[in-house]
């Protein structure tokens, strides 16, 4: 696989974040924070009326995008900031751009700026990643 500086990464898109999956993930992860499954709890905290997606799930969308592009076991480094919430029903789009291509040891690597945007354009996750180009 080849990559060039400035190349856009193939987008990964989810049409609507599922409140049922938020609740299921909260149960599996034993996440006690009710903002992921109780609309009243969200409203009581002044966070609106929609459930808030878990940060690790939002991060997972970015990882899905990277691995769909470069394949399994290609992720070498990932650093992100959570800059906004993702709510139930939101469309999300993970994307990125190649910022450098380099050789390191026996691997050809691509450094990338990565993000997750809500459908309204709000950036929810922003960061950098390094992937092996195979």
Where are the regions that the model predicts?
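Glycine-rich loops and low-complexity Gly/Arg-rich segments
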Residues: 35-41, 76-77, 104-106, 121-122
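Hot-dog-fold acyl-thioester-processing enzymes
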Residues: 1-74
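HotDog/MaoC-like acyl-thioester-processing domains
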Residues: 1-11, 85-134
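Mid-chain, well-packed structural core segment of small domains
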Residues: 66-94
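Short, intrinsically disordered/low-complexity patches at protein termini
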Residues: 33-35, 60, 76-77, 82-83, ...
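Short C-terminal domain-edge/linker segments immediately following a structured domain
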Residues: 41-47, 82, 127-130
């Amino acid at each position: 696989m080849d990559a060039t500086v400035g190349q856009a990464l193939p987008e990964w898109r989810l049409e609507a974040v599922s409140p049922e999956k938020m609740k299921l993930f909260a149960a599996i992860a034993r996440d006690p924070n009710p903002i992921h499954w109780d609309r009243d709890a969200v409203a009581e905290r002044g966070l609106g009326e929609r459930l808030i997606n878990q940060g690790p799930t939002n991060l997972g969308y970015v990882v899905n995008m990277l691995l769909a592009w470069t394949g399994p076991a290609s992720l070498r480094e990932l650093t992100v900031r959570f800059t906004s919430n993702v709510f139930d029903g939101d469309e999300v789009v993970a994307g990125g751009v190649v910022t450098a291509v380099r050789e390191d040891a026996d691997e050809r690597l691509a450094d990338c700026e990565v993000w997750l945007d809500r459908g309204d354009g709000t950036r929810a996750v922003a960061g950098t990643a390094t992937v092996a180009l195979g």
